[in-house]
Amino acid sequence: MARSRLWRPLKICGVELKHRIGMPSLSRLRASDDHTATPMMKEYYGQRSQVAGTLIITEAGIISPGAGGFPNAPGIWRDDQVAAWKTITDEVHRNGCFIICQLIHVGRAANPETAEAEGIELVSSSAIPYDEAAPVPRALTTDEIERIVHDFATAAENAIRAGFDGVELHGANGYLIDSFTQDVSNIRADEYGGSVENRSRLVYEVMRAVGDAIGPQRVGLRLSPWSTFQGMRMRDPVPQFSDVITKAKELSLSYIHLVEPRVTNNEDAEHAVHETLDFAIDLWTGPILLAGGYRPDNVQRVLDDAYPNKDIMVMFGRAFVANPDLVFRIKNSLPLNAYHRSTFYTVKNPAGYIDYPFSEQFLHRLQNLVVAGSKKKKKKKEEEEEEEEEQ
């Protein structure tokens, strides 16, 4: 495994990663009631940035007061939210790692109870609910769409102020951008619907506005072409998502982040043999992040055998939840902690969030590094004292 491309550097958003195992965006609902990042979140991300050179993508950051709809999800539209995130990015950078902020407008997928409590109106590309039991959203006007594009750009600027190395646009899983991209949710008859080109318009405008605001090489895009989560999945997503990816390439985005068809949200899913991401991987010439059901025993095959000529990075979600030292464990072929699905979304609860143990081997290595660092510091101090005496 040590010779695998998994351990080769990769440049994303202008920073050089030391390996190709990353942590994707994972909603955990541990922010405050007013959507501000908490000290508990700082500890969580700090734990998972203990192996230098690792890339972390945060849980989705809500771009504006009306863009949310999940309880205790963090936002990035207020100055105090920016300041709270800065404590987290500083911690991650102190550990020698890198961190990207995912940006989201939840759209029609907002939790109805949370939306009502916070005065959020459920909106989407069209007045189509994501399932029969869900509320019917209101179709956005073109003026409102323009404002949302602006909100994404402002949130991206806030993310850079907060110390993030870049941003990732959430264009997957049935949230607002995805609801415009696919014809199962978009039946508009204006410039934002009715054709492949028009359905790509919102994501294109967001990519362009965010790229203009912070530079396209600080921007990535997450897509889930085959996912059925939250009422999605076109009959044939290939032409539509090929168009989106082509536009992302034209705008010189840093990377694309693709969700495998074998997962739906945090669950494994059945999929047909022809449902692959190959069309997207073939189109894109830059770094590609792949997420969905990867295990330590199959990642080497993906990088070294399946896509040997592509700059692939593999993202581990559930495994990173339960293993703060995941990269170390994979590199040293150590067993993984089991994750507890029941604690994934327990609001403001430290259980199942910051209490997963590091491996004994990692803690021993960390202790040795601390001892070595202390000896080096002591030796340097002695040398400086000797120089002062000679003078």
Enumerate the language-model features and the residues they cover.
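Intrinsically disordered, low-complexity polybasic segments
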Residues: 376-384
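Flavin-dependent oxidoreductase catalytic cores
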Residues: 1-377, 389-391
